[in-house]
Amino acid sequence: MAAVAAASAELLIIGWYIFRVLLQVFLECCIYWVGFAFRNPPGTQPIARSEVFRYSLQKLAHTVSRTGRQVLGERRQRAPN
């Protein structure tokens, strides 16, 4: 039973890091794709470069990071046998 709990915790941590990497990739490059849904019409400044949208994405990344640290917490030490 303890092995299953440990494996679940490891998978949760791995999944969390994968989510963070994907979020960072989204913030850095995917916003500027030509077909991205949040782009403005041609000849206008892309919404991704506007201060409000950039601030919202940065705040989202910070909130997700803080929440993840609260959920995952510190790694627990094994109880002595």
From Swiss-Prot:
Keyword ATP-binding listed: no
Domain of life: Eukaryota
Alphabetical UniProt keywords: Developmental protein
A biological-process GO annotation: establishment of localization in cell
GO cellular component, one term: cytoplasm
InterPro entries per record: Neuronatin
Tissue specificity note: Highest in brain and ovary.
UniProt keyword Cytoplasm, yes or no: no
Classification via PANTHER family: NEURONATIN
UniProt function note: May participate in the maintenance of segment identity in the hindbrain and pituitary development, and maturation or maintenance of the overall structure of the nervous system.
Family designation: Belongs to the neuronatin family.
Descriptive protein name: Neuronatin
Organism: Mus musculus
